[in-house]
A protein has these predicted regions:
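N-terminal amphipathic alpha-helix/helix-capping segment at the start of soluble metabolic enzymes
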Residues: 1-11
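Active-site beta-loop-alpha junctions enriched in small/polar residues
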Residues: 14-16, 42-46, 103-105
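Conserved, mostly hydrophobic/aromatic
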Residues: 12, 31, 111
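Active-site beta->alpha loop and helix N-cap motifs at the rims of alpha/beta catalytic domains
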Residues: 64-119
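Glycine-rich, proline-tolerant flexible connector loops at the mouths of alpha/beta enzymes
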Residues: 37-78
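Structural preference for beta-strand elements that scaffold enzyme active sites
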Residues: 8-10, 38-40, 97-99, 117-118
Length: 119
């Protein structure tokens, strides 16, 4: 996987799948085709990131997500847990490493069960 003195290129998918599983797979294919060694996901749910609140402290007041509250943003941006196993298998099938950044202890436990190679 990692060879001394050779760059290991990682493509970050993050929320760029826009909630579309087919697009997530397409992004993985594109990463592979363009020379990436691995694709990184993010593992979290809205509930593990914040609380569902409409109070002003949880409202985004500027930028791309202006008007959203934090819970809605994280709910929109997350990679569904039900996709992870399928995306890991797809990566293995086409020959690219898939891994993820866990945002909390439950995500670490989840990734351990999937035998995530690194996080």
């Amino acid at each position: 996987m990692i060879i001394k003195n050779i760059p290991f290129l990682i493509a970050e998918i993050s929320a760029n799948h826009n909630g579309n599983f087919k697009l997530a797979k397409k992004l993985i294919r594109c990463a592979k085709r363009n020379g990436a060694d691995a694709v990184k996901l993010q593992t979290f749910t809205a509930d593990t990131m914040t609380i569902k609140s409409k109070k002003k402290y949880f409202k985004i007041t500027n930028g791309l997500w202006k008007g959203y509250n934090l819970w809605d943003l994280y709910n929109k941006a997350h990679t569904p847990l039900s996709w992870h196993k399928k995306l890991f298998a797809y990566g293995k099938k086409i020959g690219i490493t898939i891994f993820s950044t866990p945002f909390d202890e439950t995500a670490v436990d989840f990734l351990e069960k999937l035998e995530c190679p690194i996080y």
